[in-house]
Design a protein with these regions (language model features):
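Glycosyltransferase catalytic domains, chiefly GT-A lineage
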Residues: 1-144
Length: 144
């Protein structure tokens, strides 16, 4: 396995997009199956069913799932409770056993190989796409 973790968060509402995104990465990212992958979900906020986990495992048999429980995410004020699942993206900063973490949202499509950009992103920074000089779009980040 390569030492760059592919990571996302997911619940049942976004399974169709996730399956398309993962399939598109599998098709376009060089050596995709050599990257470890972890999918975060939260049974306390918005769960990912066993059935949907199995659908993902058919695409990426080595995928790991982690059920996150963090009381802060449940207590934080939000306009719409369904948006609490977005707090799980903060968990992509926790893994320290990898050289980098590539965090992606499941509402995207990979249309060409992005591995060079991931592998050459600076190790000492968080690289994102979009945004401005003051902020980034947190839907795609490489954490070094």
């Amino acid at each position: 396995m390569k030492n760059i973790l592919f990571m996302t968060h997911l619940d049942d509402k976004f399974i169709d997009g996730a399956l398309v995104m993962i399939y598109s990465m599998k098709k376009n990212v060089k050596d995709f199956m050599e990257y470890p992958m972890k999918i975060l979900h939260s049974s306390a906020i918005s769960d990912l069913s066993v059935e949907n986990r199995e659908k993902i495992k058919k695409l990426v048999p080595h995928v790991e799932f982690e059920d996150i429980y963090n009381q802060s995410y449940m207590d934080a004020p939000v306009q719409y409770p369904k948006h609490r699942v977005a707090f799980l993206s903060l968990e992509c900063f926790r893994p320290t056993e990898y050289e980098k973490v590539f965090f992606f949202d499941c509402d995207m499509l990979c249309i060409r190989d992005i591995s060079e950009g991931i592998e050459t992103a600076p190790n000492e920074y968080v690289s994102g796409c979009g945004g401005s000089i003051d902020d980034i779009n947190c839907g795609l980040m490489v954490i070094g």
